[in-house]
Regions:
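Active-site ligand-binding patch in enzyme domains
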Residues: 2-26, 30-37, 41-159
């Protein structure tokens, strides 16, 4: 999931959607999913990286360059160890946010260690309970009765 504010709209190629005009206080949310024609998010062998091919990967990087914040669940970090940076197009790396209610993010994850962009882990566990590099910001959130975090907090993120 990516959030976008009007102040970070970069020069775009024609296939990148154009952001509607909005005030500086509003956000746009873009969801990006990689899946095959048969609806799978991984190949038969379990490979989940680059499933959409080179064009899809370039499009993903363009969306990241366009966004202020990119948000992923801890499952994506555990399975894919993503960098969540802009590499295939010109642009600035967005803030990276990991939703991790149970504190499962691996301390050796690339996005926690490369310092390429501001990184935030949202967890129900206290920062002192997580073994994360000092430059990573931990935001401790309460869980609801079903053990879930409210995603409304994402709307308050600023890069």
């Amino acid at each position: 999931m990516h959030t976008l504010s009007n102040n970070r709209v970069h020069e775009r190629e024609s296939w990148v959607p154009k952001a509607p005009k909005s005030s500086s206080t509003s956000s746009i949310v873009i969801a990006q999913i990689g899946q095959s024609l048969d609806g799978q998010v991984a190949t038969a062998s379990g490979q989940s990286k680059y499933i959409n091919g080179a064009g899809g990967l370039r499009h993903l990087h363009a969306l990241r360059a366009w966004a202020d914040v990119v948000v992923v669940g801890v499952g994506s970090v555990v399975a894919d160890d993503p960098k969540l940076t802009v590499r295939l197009v010109d642009g600035t790396n967005p803030m990276r946010v990991v939703l991790d209610p149970k504190g499962r993010v691996p301390s050796q994850s690339q996005l926690l260690n490369d310092q390429a962009a501001k990184t935030v882990v949202m967890s129900a566990r206290q920062a002192t309970d997580l073994l994360l590099p000092a430059h990573v910001t931990v935001v401790t959130l309460a869980l609801d009765d079903n053990g879930k975090m409210s995603l409304l907090v994402i709307s308050f993120l600023k890069s």
